[in-house]
Amino acid sequence: MVIAFLARLAAKLFWRVRVSGEPAPLFGRRVLIIANHPHPLDAFFLGCCLPVRPVVLFPREELRSFRTRLLARFFDHETWDINDPMTVKKALRLIERGRIVAMFPEGRVERAANVMKIYEGAAMLAMRSGASLVPIHVEHREDRGFGDTRVQLHIHSATHIDPRRQAGPRARREAGARELAATMQAAAFRSHVAQGLYDAFLDAVQRRGRRTEILEDMREEPKTYGDLLKASLAIGRWLARYTQPGETVGVMLPNMFASVGAVLGLQCQGRVAAMLNYTSGPHGIESARVTANLRTVVTSRAFVEQAGLEPLIAALEGVRILHLEDIRQEFGVLDKLWLVGFAMRAPRLVRVRVNPHDVAAILFTSGSEGRPKGVALSHAAMQANIRQIATVLDFSPADKVLNALPMYHVYSFTAGVWLCLLTGTQLFLYVSPLRYRAIPEIAYRRDATYLFGTSTFLGFYARHAHPGDFGTVRYVISGGEKLGEEVAKTWLEKFGLRIFEGYGATECTVISLSTPLGYRQGCVGRLLPGTEARIEKVPGIERGGVLHVRGPALMLGYMQYDAPGLIQPVSSEFGEGWYRTGDVVDIDDEGFLRIVGRVKRFAKIAGEMVSLDQVERVAAAASPACLHAAVLKLEAAGGETTVLFTADPELTRSRLLKAARALGAQELAVARNMIHMPEIPLLGNGKTDYVRLMELVADDSVWATRC
């Protein structure tokens, strides 16, 4: 007992181990602790620091370390081969005798924060023991500074896994491993404590160190956390002179270091950043101004001149326009003394404290089906989504993300910027996704390991890239639109890279994501931890239905043009807190999501429901090198018909019929009408501009080009 007490005291003093959560689940009749394994000393921490004394099972190879062998004398343990059935039987006997057993189902020390492979031997032990599973999430925070290493053991509620519905022992083991992984992912996600985004950024600065390189833009001058901290404090102080606490401030800036500094500066001063889509034209900008009730917009003179955005500035009549170039003249000597002598030394004393459930940012829907709406995202929601992604993807400080998607796109803003800032993953921001030759070259020169893009942009990159340009890339993640089959095939054949498709919406950021451990062709992965889903059946659609989701990453509500600045809480047919995505989705027995199409993009023709997305897939199969888009047209008799816009001047209906037969699609999936045009109109985020196409369908002069 004395030795155990001294071991626990040493752990708390030297490693600052802290235990959180309700310990009651540990005192059950049969208890099996499942824990992640981020550090070689985790077995020692579990064995000595919990309110119970478990028998810790850990891999035999970890005893090669002298430190581990020394510390193993202070707690009960067993070495085991996670694939050996005899070892599993030994652990079962321990549980049957009433001992509490702790194990690491991943079988090794983790590479990153995500949950890795779960061994079937661990799942077998969890199933056959009949024990209550108590997830414990182990978190290491190695801050810069003596004695600042902190270890947190988060105890979560007990659960059970029950894969008995699966037929066959192997299927049950595989299902058990999936349930075990989902349990550990949920524990990792729930261990996160929400705070203000700027506080989370300061935590990352402290954890990684101010000299650590974190951000690079097209100037190719690496910037450190310290550079970003200084920029955020300076820009924040300058912006605070022209704005009020809690005010929504428009941000119209490209993907640059100063843009990230401006967003962080607004967060530092307790302002709300409204990310403006500068490709939406004067009408779109004016709509966003009214919707978000903007009085101030921050931009750059150089950006406005180079991008030709003068008409957008003119549309912001009555709005104060702040240019980042002016900070050099307006940031005086006293400001610089404040920055260097006080703010940089104690940034937490100058930042404005915020409620994590207050609005952090406003993004706008794409407007592909009507007037854009403002989407209010809270600090807690954005951090929740970042945490969800980090539990399924192995981001680490050794990675470098190449992100060319504009920050007004939620996919780019959350996963492409904030995730990197808060996890310490290096980020390269490129100013435009439209430079199809430059982006592959940057990936080659800067050793990018992650590439974010939409299907449209990824297709163009593949067309212009050299086979060696993406040699260092580990993950290519597609989002924002349906991944084209031809695009996925091209990337696999030309670069040897599988594209992992994500699915989400501005209203709830990323909902599901394909990963190496959760991949099925034609699907968009499984729901992220903490996200719930329900399906609303649609008459005429046999498989799947409209997806409704609920979770911690959901928006606070919409802002509408006719109710400026007012946040309208989200709800759906299933009640408050549920969001109706409008997408028809089919979820299989293993939890994989398959997107069937938008519910608004189904036509009833000859008594059958026809998906416009299927019409586009047939066109893509017939002419994979060109873009195509399908819309509905109301006929004079009151029915509906399909219209295909194509950039292929040689595409004919006979080719479409041949492609439909090859795909096994019904003949109704071949468009009744076809219009050739030089290029398909796109929005700034790469999505098809269906509003513009509907306007063209209504224009009689366009039908002169009909085939």
What is the predicted role of each segment?
Residues R320-D326, A603, A630-L634, V643-F645, ...:
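Conserved C-terminal "lid"/linker of ANL adenylate-forming enzymes
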Residues V297, L451, G551, L556-G557, ...:
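AMP-binding/adenylate-forming catalytic core of the ANL superfamily
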Residues I321-L324, R328-F364, G370-R371, D394-K400:
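Conserved pre-ATP/AMP-binding loop-to-beta segment of ANL
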Residues Q383-K400, V410-T449, H464:
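Conserved AMP-binding/adenylation subdomain of ANL enzymes
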Residues W238-S280, A404-P406, M609:
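Conserved AMP-binding/adenylate-forming
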Residues L324, A448-G453, A462-Q521, E532-R534:
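Gly/Ser/Thr-rich phosphate-binding loop
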